[in-house]
């Protein structure tokens, strides 16, 4: 096989891999993990069953990659806002706004996001792609909160790492809430209320 043929084969390989991931994401949204079979994924992707093991090693690894992509697309706009150069309070509010916008535009993705949390609870490997994304979220949130505290914008008693974990818990809880009670308090209200409470903590006398 010459260089041109190898490059052509590489392009075909890349396309098949992407189709499998996209097909898996579609199946997860519509069927959930339990009812997403290898055969269904292959049929949806227009690939043969052997392609799953060829590109990913197993269906489990393919599902993990698909869930990681689902989470990454949902959370990346917020991460971009958090890592910006604006005032930390503005970055935090912008990140919340980005999450709200994605949530509103992609409500059909809520079932797949629920599967992300279930998968993360079952597979706690630090090398697992979903764990890597959550770690990035924690680190960036913690950095912004630490900067807010250093600038005396929030109470000094607030621990950045613990608050970052709490915010992630609120994010996950909001997804669950929207899934089981779509007519209840809206995600915009929940997110805005939480941010307001955090940013108001300095004036509330909770600092030490």
Regions from the language model: what does each represent?
Residues 75-76, 80, 105-114, 124-151, ...:
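Amphipathic alpha-helical packing segments from all-alpha helical-bundle domains
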Residues 19, 23, 27-65:
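Helix-turn-helix
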Residues 30-31, 85, 106, 151:
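Short coil/turn segments at alpha/beta junctions that flank glycine-rich nucleotide-binding fingerprints
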Residues 58, 122-124:
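Short loop-to-helix capping motifs
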Residues 1-15, 22, 26, 204-208:
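N-terminal intrinsically disordered/low-complexity leader segments
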Residues 68-74:
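Short, basic, alpha-helical segments at the C-terminal edge of helix-turn-helix-like DNA-binding modules
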Residues 65, 76-110, 160-167, 188:
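Hydrophobic alpha-helical connector segments
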Residues 125-131, 135, 149-198, 205-208:
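Hydrophobic/aromatic-rich alpha-helical bundle segments in the mid-to-C-terminal region
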